[in-house]
Amino acid sequence: VNSSVVKITLSNPNGGFIRNLAWGDAIILDPETADSAVSEPNGTGPFKFSKWIKGDRVELVKNYDYWGEAIALEKASFKFISDPTAAFAALMAGDVDAFPVYPAPETLAQFEADPNFNVIVGSTEGETILSTNNKSEKLKDIRVRKAIAHAINRQAIVDGAMFGFGTPIGTHFAPHHPDYIDLTAQSNYDPEKSKSLLSEAGVSNSLTLSLKLPPPSYARRGGEIIASQLREVGIETKIENLEWAQWLEQVFKGKDYDLTIVSHTEPMDIGIYGNPSYYFQYDSQEFRNLMDALNLETNDQERSKILKNAQKLIADDYVNGYLFQLAKTGVANSKLIGLWKNSPTQANDLTGVSWSN
């Protein structure tokens, strides 16, 4: 249309198109440098790529040619620190100024009591689930999946693994979304009901499941708690801790697992249940029909009805164990202002960040 406005014409209506453009993956690249974007990105944002020291950090500098309002920061450095103990030490030593998503919730109280830091607690789009391989011979029977759901005490997991940070969920949808329906009562903690369902399925005290866990603390800690809860109803688990590369290869790609725990942080990603080849292998034509209707629907009220029906369907089918919505727990130097409290998409946006005097 002009130098700063484009017109996009779609071949079919797509009610989610505008939302998709807000994803972190939806970026604008210079066609002349797009092929080298993986190692030397050249985009349109308020920062320019400066340096990538693999395994250590990525450095950005201010883009003085930015089309929008000028930013306050001259540069920013993103360091890679995955170990919770190292994260705590880095903040205390002043080696880093902020952890937008801090990996050690057990030490947040210490930062809250320290005037040199701000603890920033908000919401994410991360549905944390006990992902279930629906094609596993041990888990094909809905009564077994339902028994697992009733064996799980969500609040105990939130308290024990996340130190109280998180909101229990009963389906794959963010509680802060206006179309969310609370279905937690449908799979409430009821060990006796769980035992009865296992008996009906003919697997009482004879079921052993693999539980493969990726690195995040919510998975490792949550996995131990869930294993204990399942043991109380007669289900044994074989826990295997994996690094991300192993998890992606064995679980996500290879589908070689019974249970795993992961937080799905993409916004409005309930559509993954429409893909029977996705790693939990849920195959429902009824659900696919709902997603087809959703993609073509542009009326918000009609989309809301479809989304609520979709939430109910996957809860009724006990596709996965729905645990909690991941909280965004951040820690920052008290003089640093403007960091996101909530995480509506997968991004660390520093556009509005500055240092106070």
Can you say where each PLM-predicted feature lies in the sequence?
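Detector for C-terminal structural segments
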Residues: 53, 151-179, 218-227, 245-357
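Gly/Pro-rich hinge or "lid" segments in bacterial periplasmic/extracellular proteins
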Residues: 19-71, 75, 83-85, 192, ...
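Surface-exposed binding/hinge segments that line
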Residues: 1-29
